[in-house]
Amino acid sequence: MPPRLRPGSVCSRCHFHRRSLSSTAFLAQKQAERPPPPPEAGHVRLVNRALISLTGADSTSFLQGLITQNVVSAKSRASPTTPFYAGFLNAQGRLLHDTFIYPTLPEENGGNEGMELGYLIEVDKEQVTNLLKHLKKHKLRAKLKFRALDEGERGVWAVWDNAKNWETKDTGDVLREVITCADNRAPAFGYRVLLAGDNLQNLSQPLPGQQASLSTYTLRRILHGIPEGQDELGRESALPMDSNMDIMGGIDFHKGCYLGQELTIRTHHRGVVRKRVLPVQLYNTEDPKPMPSSSGIPVYSPDSQLLLPSAGANITKSSASGKGRSAGKFISRIGNVGLALCRLETMTDISLTGESSQYNPSEEFKISWEANADAGVAEAGEVKVTAFIPPWVKDYILHGGTRQRQTKEDVHRAKSGTEQIEEED
């Protein structure tokens, strides 16, 4: 008989770790939480992100063994100088942290660690302690130091300008108080900028647009289908490809051994990613199914008065009786738009195996809930939901992404590796 779970806990087999329902779980969001549509240009201080400093002679090789992206250049074997997006996995290949990695100059690290570059690791602020524990667990005898940066040491900013591809001239090797990183998780999504403190005066040119709220950045991210932070990426349960980390440039499938690589490579070369995080739009049950915007993403309405489901709610077919089979999991939302983990062949017209698809364009999907006095939900409710595939995501899935660039040697090496893994299993 399986052990009983404590009230409010989550089974380890559940795909997403979610909080228990609260009394406000199904209430319409407050107006303050529903920002206006994102401006064409703007900048936001990301107070929900934090930085960890990693320095030392072994810092590059240490990171190389822990993250999904290739730290060392395959040709020159040199340490990187350009920031990049990457993930930390556990030994089972499940996602622990989504991060941006910023190489720093030796002088910034005090000049006492030889000529090895140091690194700043940007991570979900709520996960700093967990990532520090993860680094400490794998440090062993490596010559390195790590610490969480104090509040105010450096600020993380998101910057965008839809009218032009903004890029500051103040790169890390010109002005050490400023480090920039192209955010390539979606086309023309913008930049990350690290500033010493929050002093915008350090920049030789102003950031584009006006300073906006964190909810504005979150809305823009949701519309582009970008999950961020462990509330959205399913810590220790989701595969990195489920959260589109491959599409967003966070995985190097040609890289050598790193923690969690086996399942990642096996899924890439021999498996099919059947579920992915997609942007979704919510609408009332009596309303017609919404159409995407001209750019293929949901249409946001700041005036929406929908009753909203909580994170982790099941998505089912509207025609299904009772609970029905899950077509996806709702993740997060602002107003009438959000993110959901969707079964591609059920909720979209994507065919993964070349066989007949389960998708029916006339089919609609719903999220239903029942009254729960203990949770403060006075009455039952239901909203409909439709998923959208941003054009760059669809193109990657249909054309195989990086698989198109595999050589025969890559395929043979992957096949040999996965056969060995299966023998060990």
UniProtKB/Swiss-Prot annotation:
It holds the Pfam family Beta-barrel_CAF17_C. InterPro entries: TrmE/GcvT_dom1, YgfZ/GcvT, YgfZ/GcvT_CS. GO terms for molecular function: transferase activity. SUPFAM superfamilies: Folate-binding domain (SSF103025). Residues 1-28 form a transit peptide. It comes from the Eukaryota. Keywords: Mitochondrion, Transit peptide. GO terms for cellular component: mitochondrial matrix. GO terms for biological process: iron-sulfur cluster assembly. It is found in: Mitochondrion matrix. Residues 403-425 are annotated as: Disordered. Its main location: mitochondrion. Belongs to the GcvT family. CAF17/IBA57 subfamily. This is Iron-sulfur cluster assembly factor IBA57 homolog, mitochondrial. It comes from Coccidioides immitis (strain RS). The gene is CAF17.
